[in-house]
Amino acid sequence: MELHSLSKRNSPVDPCNALEWSSGETSGDHIEEATIRDAFCYQKNLVSTPRADVVEVCRLSTSPASPTSLLQDSAIQTSFSLSGPPDSGNNQVMADRKVCNCCSQELETSFTYVDENVNLEQRSQRSPSAKGSNHPVDLGWGNPNEWSHETAMSLMSEDDDDTSSEATSSGKSVDYGFISAILFLVTGILLVIISYIVPREVTVDPNTVAAREMERLEKESAMLGAHLDRCVIAGLCLLTLGGVVLSCLLMMSMWKGELYRRNRFASSKESAKLYGSFNFRMKTSTNEDTLELSLVEEDALAVQS
């Protein structure tokens, strides 16, 4: 045994052709060496084949591994480690075998990963169908209660916007009209005051002034009096115009206030019918003939009745 192992280590004999040297060994050693040599010869013959063939062989050999195949793999690895520095063919065989093992592992993992994806896709395909079968009415309208609430809120906001726009527009018109009326009144008053303050007659002594100079002064005073009369007339017109504008604005404001009060009263009646609130009730007193407005709750009236 020792001589045979020494000669085997020292001589580079092809193990594929040296099957007769191991005839005198024990049965277990003979079986192990036979399997090692068979595998090595098979891999050496595959060196000349392309890499794609090796990959195909590896794929075909990815069946459930038996204990004998595992024993052969371990024996091949030990034989390569003991045989000294391997050549380029042996290196290529080892690399191909490692690639085959990696490919088999990747194929196994990718197979399970594909199964998971298929299951997930099947679940995702079943979920919308189940949702569609359970909720056929849901077409994107949402909850009808929420929709009605949103519509009511939108209508209320539109009404508020309309009332606010009307109030702002009426307020602007009323403000401009009131300012113009005040300006007319103030201007008319000032013109009337100026026309009465400015003196119209000549205050010069006629004995100290020549006759022609006196005539000229009288003409100027007459022209000044005419201008002052015009100022008085303009002032009175402006006062009248300011009073008319102010009275019109006052009437318009009263009319709008009455309309607003009626609208609010009507809305309060509607809200009282819907939700219950305070209502105005006219009642006559037994002692006096006057009418009194009293606020009575609708709920209290219902309880009393």
UniProtKB/Swiss-Prot annotation:
The modification Phosphoserine is found at residue 11. Keywords: Autophagy, Cytoplasmic vesicle, Lysosome, Membrane, Phosphoprotein, Transmembrane, Transmembrane helix. The chain crosses the membrane at residues 178-198, 232-252. Its main location: membrane. GO terms for cellular component: autophagosome membrane; cytoplasmic vesicle; lysosomal membrane; plasma membrane. GO terms for biological process: general adaptation syndrome, behavioral process; macroautophagy. One of its GO terms (molecular function) is transmembrane transporter binding. Residues 122-143 are annotated as: Disordered. The keyword Transmembrane helix applies. Pfam families: Neurensin. It is found in: Lysosome membrane; Cytoplasmic vesicle, Autophagosome membrane. The keyword Transmembrane helix applies. It is a multi-pass membrane protein. Residues 122-132 have a biased composition (Polar residues). Plays an essential role in autophagy. TMEM74-induced autophagy may involve PI3K signal transduction. Belongs to the TMEM74 family. This is Transmembrane protein 74.
